[in-house]
């Protein structure tokens, strides 16, 4: 190793990213037994803190204290760094602009399940840590094209975890700004650069959310519904669904890491 920054915990919160000027941004802390971090940090090259955010929700610690936490898990993105990696013309900044965080919130939604949900909530914050936009997955389950069998399976909460006391029903594992792309330039507003692409590992679905909250594009969960999805076949347990940035080979295409394994709801196939 030629350089090391201390103070991060990437296991629950996802990637750390090196930004211009030797600034590193990533998640820190943990809220066990949940798979989530407590704060998002930016450190300079010497390891000095430049920016931090934790004022999302209050949680109780093991000793009963109430503390602020991001409850952030798996992914976060900068508005000026939509794919999370460098591409021509991309110049991300650490302490200006907006940041998108994938977070948890726990509640019961009887229409989904009578078990406590560990629901996915996207929040977008500005440089001052103010929440300027949010999206709650459970509010949009009817838009995600689950059939009756799949909804019944979700209602039974097969992934309920007693240790957590909750059911991570969607298990979103990535959330990216769409970013500049030729589809939008050609008039397809579903791919507006500030819309968000979300990957659901648990139900093998990738979808785009517009800024009004509605799901405007979707891949899965049933890959037999259209000839285009039949040609793909199936994705299972996928991660890092995003639009390839302008200036790179395949720009405008969606890149998905298809992990395989087991996921999805409904009757066994």
Give names to the regions the model predicted.
Residues 1-269:
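Histidine-/acidic-rich catalytic cores in large beta-rich domains
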